[in-house]
Amino acid sequence: MSSDAEMAVFGEAAPYLRKSEKERIEAQNRPFDAKTSVFVAEPKESFVKGTIQSKDAGKVTVKTEAGATLTVKEDQIFPMNPPKYDKIEDMAMMTHLHEPAVLYNLKERYAAWMIYTYSGLFCVTVNPYKWLPVYNPEVVAAYRGKKRQEAPPHIFSISDNAYQFMLTDRENQSILITGESGAGKTVNTKRVIQYFATIAVTGDKKKEEATSGKMQGTLEDQIISANPLLEAFGNAKTVRNDNSSRFGKFIRIHFGTTGKLASADIETYLLEKSRVTFQLKAERSYHIFYQITSNKKPELIEMLLITTNPYDYPFVSQGEISVASIDDQEELMATDSAIDILGFTNDEKVSIYKLTGAVMHYGNMKFKQKQREEQAEPDGTEVADKAAYLQGLNSADLLKALCYPRVKVGNEYVTKGQTVEQVTNAVGALAKAMYEKMFLWMVTRINQQLDTKQPRQYFIGVLDIAGFEIFDFNSLEQLCINFTNEKLQQFFNHHMFVLEQEEYKKEGIEWTFIDFGMDLAACIELIEKPMGIFSILEEECMFPKATDTSFKNKLYEQHLGKSANFQKPKVVKGKAEAHFSLIHYAGTVDYNITGWLDKNKDPLNETVVGLYQKSSVKTLAYLFSGAQTAEAEASSGGAAKKGAKKKGSSFQTVSALFRENLNKLMTNLRSTHPHFVRCIIPNETKTPGAMEHELVLHQLRCNGVLEGIRICRKGFPSRILYADFKQRYKVLNASAIPEGQYIDSKKASEKLLGSIDIDHTQYKFGHTKVFFKAGLLGLLEEMRDDKLAQLITRTQAMCRGFLARVEYQKMVERRESIFCIQYNIRAFMNVKHWPWMKLFFKIKPLLKSAETEKEMATMKEEFQKTKDDLAKSEAKRKELEEKMVSLLKEKNDLQLQVQAEAEGLADAEERCDQLIKTKIQLEAKIKEVTERAEDEEEINAELTAKKRKLEDECSELKKDIDDLELTLAKVEKEKHATENKVKNLTEEMAGLDETIAKLTKEKKALQEAHQQTLDDLQAEEDKVNTLTKAKIKLEQQVDDLEGSLEQEKKLRMDLERAKRKLEGDLKLAQESIMDIENEKQQLDERLKKKEFEMSNLQSKIEDEQAIGIQLQKKIKELQARIEELEEEIEAERASRAKAEKQRSDLSRELEEISERLEEAGGATSAQIEMNKKREAEFQKMRRDLEEATLQHEATAATLRKKHADSVAELGEQIDNLQRVKQKLEKEKSEMKMEIDDLASNVETVSKAKGNLEKMCRTLEDQVSELKSKEEEQQRLINDLTTQRGRLQTESGEFSRQLDEKEALVSQLSRGKQAFTQQIEELKRQLEEEVKAKNALAHALQSSRHDCDLLREQYEEEQESKAELQRALSKANSEVAQWRTKYETDAIQRTEELEEAKKKLAQRLQAAEEHVEAVNAKCASLEKTKQRLQNEVEDLMLDVERTNAACAALDKKQRNFDKILAEWKQKYEETHAELEASQKEARSLGTELFKMKNAYEESLDQLETLKRENKNLQQEISDLTEQIAEGGKRIHELEKIKKQVEQEKCELQAALEEAEASLEHEEGKILRIQLELNQVKSEIDRKIAEKDEEIDQLKRNHIRVVESMQSTLDAEIRSRNDAIRIKKKMEGDLNEMEIQLNHSNRMAAEALRNYRNTQGILKDTQLHLDDALRGQEDLKEQLAMVERRANLLQAEIEELRATLEQTERSRKIAEQELLDASERVQLLHTQNTSLINTKKKLETDISQIQGEMEDIVQEARNAEEKAKKAITDAAMMAEELKKEQDTSAHLERMKKNMEQTVKDLQLRLDEAEQLALKGGKKQIQKLEARVRELEGEVESEQKRNAEAVKGLRKHERRVKELTYQTEEDRKNILRLQDLVDKLQAKVKSYKRQAEEAEEQSNTNLSKFRKIQHELEEAEERADIAESQVNKLRVKSREVHTKIISEE
């Protein structure tokens, strides 16, 4: 934003362009609440500002600035922008972009008189309705060369940008100033022209004035002056605008190579000439009328014979006559000076004023009706005299021409009477035509004057066209104007929204297409397309009796109810009648069609036009010189034909001319780079500063302002080609682009932009250009300017440094020279007083004196010579100087001449170019005329020559007839031969019919078998569905009843039995397919037999074709002769027509003579006699002409007779043949060969032969088609059967399809190989896992001390498991790829088959239509037969190879089965080991139960513990409720997921440690049993020692109690922390359980869908494989492999589960072993005090034992559940289920351990109390117990660490399983789509089979029909023979006649 100092250059315009700094600071500091400040929708003012008071249930209460309170919906409020965006210059920069924000920004700027605002890529201007100082010269200078962002918004900124774009981009520009009428378009257009005329002056005005003598001003002045002149004659006051342009103009300002003005031209569109004679009440006519009557120039009033009162002239005073905002007197002076500046001559200027005055007088001409007649006559001649005087006419002639016009009726001219209304309309039409032509002539003269002939390179076009108009009365002019605005708006929309986004797509930029809903095509097409409004209007204008009513009816019939934009208007009282309504983009407009036909035809009184052409006012004569009247046309004499043509071409309706000009305009605009200025009308009352919200909003919506801002903000409005960008902006970082090596412009641009410090999201790279967001290019330009400034500064510094160094070097050299001189002078000064040196000085000159004397003498001589030479040279020099002066003068003169000649040469070159163009056009016309003349001469010569040749040709025809007789004899022989062939063919067809019947039976049988297989497959699918349902039920039973492992095995066996049953059904289906293949082989053998028979037929057909070709050649020769004779007849007809034209010319001349006689005066008797004589002469000439025509007809008749004698006198036979020819021509090209029957009977014979050949071919085609249809039906079962019944061309195509199917076989085999590889990989992985299991089991049995080693092996096993999962997912993805590829290939094959079917149908039709195609097809059949045989052999080889491959695969399958059996055996062994370990676990459980009975005595002491346990259970129930509530906070827990996972790991580790401690307690119980006996024996001995140790124990106990108290406090704190963590973790675990359950369900469903689709896929694959030989076994084996792989995978998962269980038990056992060893040592160190605490400990142990048994039982149940889930669910679901079970088990263990910790703490408390009582021994026992607990804590910590590791592994596994689930889901969907497509194909094949049956029936009917036609052809051949005999007789008679005549 510029400062106030920078804005000072704009002078007094600064406050009208940009806010001051003070206002900006105040706006930024103004208080603003972004949450409550809003715009709210309000009915009266559309939107008002307000603040939100409250919100309630979708309703918002807003208090407006006016104090009103509104309650609206939330979608009716819009957020307000911060204050810093108030009066923003570019609305695209606003934070909140919506309608109220744009409206209020415009309103606030308009209130501050800032009328220009940017809106993205274009400028919006609001009409101020007052003068503002924003167009002053200092403003023009301030905007010159400024970038858009550097200066405030202004029309000058748009203009300067267009100018700069033209110079930099070297592309034509255009500025489209659009908007509604009264929005300020004309003013902005003038300002644009003013700007260009100011900044781009030519600079050489003197030269310009010298080169163009007529010019009164410079080019700049002329361009500016064109506007006042055009406005005076083309602008008028309307309801909405005081200075409305009533015509459109497109001003092109041309610039030279340097950017200076070169020339200009103006194109105008659609002047509203109806305004000349009619205005509405609130409007007035064109300004010129009122300027003239303003009396500013009284000489005009006198010259034009008018008054100063406009009301004296009805044409210009029907509305208002004055406008407050226009000074007509000043405008008249401006118009007058503009005429002078634009170079109009004085005569032309006077003519303009005179014709304008004549138009005014025309409105005063009055006519009245004659008495008792309808004829009009003048009502006074005074006005007519004035008008005629001003037009240079005779008033009497003018009145006569108006009242009695001459009209052409036929070939005569008649004087027509006119009514008063007709004369008045004619006067108005003449006035409008004269004014329009004068306006267009003025534009042409302006263009001539503005054309300076200077070289022009580019132009900037400024479009100012009438805005959208909605008046009370809308006529044809309004429709044209509104249609133009529709086109311009569509251009704007297309350029701004569609082209912009299409270029993004074309350039490859990521862009989502935005439909802004701005397509106006419907309304445009309604107006301009065929059968649109303009089309119907022009059509009605062509009909003489058309009326407005008929036009309206046609419009209603064509569009009412059919087009949404065309409506019937409602009748409103007080408004003008409307006939139809159109919905335009700016609103609905009612149109009145009254007088549209006349307006469109624009009829003129031709008699008056003829007077105009003879006017003494040269301008008027010139205006109408191009009009070709009927009389002038008639008087053109010999050029009548040319004149008629010119009149026909000149008749063009107004609408057609308008559309032509509009299309040219749109073409010009599309070739330029457009800049849009959208003018807005603020109010209807023309009040300055007032703005009507709804009116402005309507214009914003219609003009696309909001959409333009959006596309500017979202899109990339600036773009540069890569090469241009690299060249222009390389300076920003030259190092980014390496020098000396080639680099692509795109890569260079990418590197350059990447190295610059800018926002890299603000640009995108396209294919050819780099695209920038709005504003970024300006930033780059600023950076470039700064960089250039730096570079130039650096260059200047380097240059200055170089110059300084050069100067310094010179100084150094001068210094050295000075030192040398000083040295020499000092040396001289030292020796000059030395005596010897003085002697040297004296003697040395004397030594050289003699020599010097000689030299002096020679020098004197040379001096004398040089003196003489100097005198001579001086004389010569003076002469040369004189010559030089003269030559310089001549040179200057020559330069001036050369300059003038160069300019003349440029003009001459342009003229030469124009002359060359005209010469080329004239040469083309001359060439056409000469060619026509030559053609006429050739035709005449040919006629004479052909007349002479007719007799010769008659004799030749006789010879031909003799030849035909000979050929006829041959043809008869051939006919007998063909009859025999036809009989043979009919016999063969009978055989073929039998084979067809057999084939149909076989087809039905195959269809039944196919249907049976489909039914079987459906039954299998039903079984699979029932099985899946049963499986689901079983899964539910597993979840509900927790069945045992034996039940799962039973279910598995049931499933395997079902699978075996399905496999057996599949084998049965495969056996049926083998039977079908055997039948196919039999059909192949039959096909070979048929092919052999067809080859024999082909050889016969080829022989007949050779004969047929010879006959056709002869027929064509005869036909050519007949055509020549017909051409001669046509030539005679042409000569006759020429004679008739000459007769019409003579009649025209006679009529003209009679008319001239009538015009010369009255009809005297002498003249009547002369007329009679001339009529007699005319009759005589007519008779002569008729005789001549009769002679021509006689000659033509003689020619026809001769032709009939030679050929056509063949009589009835030729007539019959001609009728046959006509009939055959109507049947298009079906029987094309029968046309030759016109020549001779030979053609009939050849036609019969052709019919026979056609029958043969059609029969063959029918057979082939039946076979092809049969093959299509059988393709579902076996695609190879498609070769049956086809001819060799069709069989070739289907053999290619067979190749494709074989390719599919190879693909499937490759897929099978891929599957086998996958299976082998699975085997290897299974072997590795089994080895790992064996190693682990061996390690478990051998030693429990290798825990760490086994743990590492377990981790490796998990990694291998993950690898297996990845490999399996990869294999599944490959399978999916193969399936998709197979699917696409299958679809392509079916599409190709359907295309082949269509091609076959086309070929059948072509064979029926073109019998000649038999020759080529017969030749191709032999080739295709050989190729087919080769392909069949290749196919047999391929089949053998596939069979061998199948055998190899069988061997591999058997080996794989053996391997699987071995794995099963190993699995059973491991399972047995697992069961043994479980039995051991049960035995341990029983021992624990026994121990529990032994410790029942301590139950009394545990009652207190039980109460506390109940309290804890209550707390646990509360915690479970909290866990349920925690499931609702899933999204919150996800945020702290990382922390929770860490805590979960710690907690799970603690749970595992607790579990280990429980297991440790079990081992402890066993040890205690052993120790009890020893303890009993020692108790008696230690009782005596008890009393002695009590005192010591008390002291020790006090210390222990204190330490225990501290430890208990720490334990309480840790317990509280653990409880808190537990609550969090329980919520997390519950959430994870829900997620796991959900994923389990999803996985189960996906698995069920997967299995269903797998079953369907197998069935469909089996159906598809039926079409491929030998593929059934492959499919079956593939299915078996997949099932076995699934079983193996399930078994692997079971083994993994059991392995994990054994691993867990192994770990527990190891931990127990360690604990046991520690406890043994501790027990040995314990004292006898354990006897008293033994019972308490035994009760604790018994309680723990019971809880442990429950835990073990729960673990067993969980294991059984996990096994069931593993067997029934898929691989992924099993893993997830296992994780869920383990997490539940850990949760239960955690709870139990918490309980045990509490119990232990209670026991500790009790132990303390007992210790106080029991003494020293009890204290020792408690201390030992404390140590035990500390050891347990340490072991728990170790287990915690191990659990963390395990938990992380499980988490990784869960992620892998979720990924695998997603892949399986995608595969299932893909398979489902494939199944749907294959089912659709099966249905289409069924439908095709039915169609084939129908086609076979139709072919049989066609065959019978052809047989019938063959019989008819034989009858016609017999008839032809009899006709030939008749022709022979007639030819002999003709011959005898000719001989007798000669």
Curated annotation (Swiss-Prot):
Residues 33-82 form the Myosin N-terminal SH3-like domain. ATP binds at residues 179-186. Disulfide bonds: none annotated. The keyword Membrane does not apply. Residues 1130-1175 are annotated as: Disordered. The modification Phosphotyrosine is found at residues 389, 1467, 1495. Residues 86-785 form the Myosin motor domain. SUPFAM superfamilies: Myosin rod fragments, P-loop containing nucleoside triphosphate hydrolases, Tropomyosin. Residues 788-817 form the IQ domain. The modification Phosphoserine is found at residues 625, 1095, 1099, 1165, 1240, 1246, 1264, 1291, 1295, 1306, 1309, 1477, 1498, 1517, 1557, 1577, 1603, 1606, 1717, 1729, 1742. PROSITE patterns: IQ (PS50096), MYOSIN_MOTOR (PS51456), SH3_LIKE (PS51844). Residues 1131-1159 have a biased composition (Basic and acidic residues). Keywords: Actin-binding, ATP-binding, Coiled coil, Cytoplasm, Methylation, Motor protein, Muscle protein, Myosin, Nucleotide-binding, Phosphoprotein, Thick filament. The modification Phosphothreonine is found at residues 64, 69, 419, 1244, 1258, 1289, 1470, 1504, 1520, 1733, 1739. PANTHER family: MYOSIN HEAVY CHAIN, NON-MUSCLE, MYOSIN-2. Muscle myosin is a hexameric protein that consists of 2 heavy chain subunits (MHC), 2 alkali light chain subunits (MLC) and 2 regulatory light chain subunits (MLC-2). Interacts with GCSAM. This is Myosin-2. It comes from Mus musculus. The lineage of its organism: Eukaryota, Metazoa, Chordata, Craniata, Vertebrata. The gene is Myh2.
